[in-house]
């Protein structure tokens, strides 16, 4: 066996005289053999790693007549205490996994191959020890053949940060991303497993709870076996089934099992990976069933609201059983998944907290329904039978059930909202005359509509008044000027469409004095990125502008600007079931803005600035084809969008010889701004969408100009609006002007 530790660590230990059991800095441990191979092999030892820990191991679980060589990254037993202040990275390579030979015993294989193992704590054959504990303050990355995180008797594995645990399904024995055998595994859920954090957690592999009531070293069953996973971010995912031998055998007095926080778009794909666990060759002390009949979860805590719910992707045909349920969760049945078949893929909820709900999502095509989707309630009733609420039979009325059933790509979605009494005597959900049935636009249409709104938002982002474009033009003392400025910000729409857009633009211009007029032109180029409810897009815009600004001797001013823009956007949107639509389109925009105001000077350089502005614009319509990931084509025809925005503003400011600062409030109203589109495709009825931008809102603008040289000044504004359909979270204009 070859085993190495970072030389810098060894040198530090020699210089300081410290013991390796006390404190170690950044460390890399390697163990590579053709048989048994363990990176860190700790029996009753204490280790404290103040920096990152990396463990790389390779070995052979089976070699010759040896069928269970231990190939493990970190192996801690007999009350060992391992503290890792930062991150841990464990890689275990094992081309011949344990128990894969001729004389194999697959029920024991998991003992001999783990990324991180903690066990044999408390009273064992080796004496009375402390609990075995491995605590990682940072993130854990584990790539292992076998089990990712394994906690045996009185062993604790606590990952306080995020985790990326990957196992590799085997055909010779069962494998798990996390396994508990009267031990504890907490990932992103604090020291006690009850405090979900906000880190990304990805677990690729089954979850297991083994009842070691057979063979040697049986567990005393003093407490439950627990695994707590905090999947609380959109980038978090669990892939695998959940085996709980205690529930399978109807003997779980400590109510041990999986506590799963599934929130904020995190996903659990319920699909057993690799070989299922076999019955032990040594036999069990009873005739109860211990084998996997479907995932069983002790606690599932969904989102606090429907908007923050997590997602279960039901793949396995066998039922999911949730003993205690709280919050809100979506359950998706995709086309081709065994769970989508009629009578398969049930979700059984034994108890639900008040105010909790589940939302079933699928398509008529995925469910292989023979029912006519045009008959109200028929398809919904068949689908909703997948929910069994046993708490209902005991008097509970806590679980809400919703249904979203896609009837096509662009065809309307069928919706059902069950009443608290819409369950039969056995607790199976059903559609009744109390159920509220409705239809809504499909998620694909909703996404495409949002993508079309991106261009409208980009046009809106390019609007400006005199101060935002040129700063305080009274600082312009020469006949000609050049200027450049940056425009950046964030805006969003959440009413009738969902777009969250950030944009960055650059504009340069040249102008000259003609009497009391400043006339000139400008070129603009910008990019934007948009997030939709289900999808994303990006865009570019380029434009030319011609303007004239007149300054009157009494403080009045008139600003006129005409602009033409060319916009390009591309997008990909999808629905909850995996169907996506991608397309790109181009628009031409034109606008004319007129602003009239007067700076009324007061004492000590203060002034007030009432103003009125009218912005007229038109964004051309576009007809184009977008394609789905299944090869079909959706034709989209968007109408032109006409806009007329009026603004009445009042500003207060203070001017000095070389500077100006101001605060401006403006009441704005959109008199038009209706965006219409039509969607059509083969085999589905044509559908329409409308986004109405007619609205009234308040703009607040803070800015100023400063002449730091006789012929050069800088200027900038910060803008935010309130109460607008197109909500400007912030906008920053920052520029510099040079006169000559």
Report each predicted region and the residues it spans.
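Solvent-exposed, glycine/polar-rich loop segments of beta-barrel outer-membrane systems
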Residues: 496-502, 533-535, 568-586, 620-642, ...
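Extracellular beta-strand/loop-rich repeat segments of large surface/secreted proteins
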Residues: 200, 204, 209-386
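Repeated loop/turn-to-beta-strand initiation elements of outer-membrane beta-barrel proteins
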Residues: 238, 516-521, 554-558, 606, ...
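Outer-membrane translocation/initiation segment of Type V secreted surface proteins
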Residues: 21-22, 327-344, 359-511, 587
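Outer membrane beta-barrel translocator domains of Type V secretion systems
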Residues: 440-604, 719, 724, 731, ...
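Gram-negative bacterial Sec-dependent N-terminal signal peptides
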Residues: 1-21, 548
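Extracellular beta-strand/beta-solenoid scaffold signature
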Residues: 28-43, 56-79, 95-124, 130-133, ...
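Outer membrane beta-barrel transmembrane domains
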Residues: 545-550, 602, 635-740
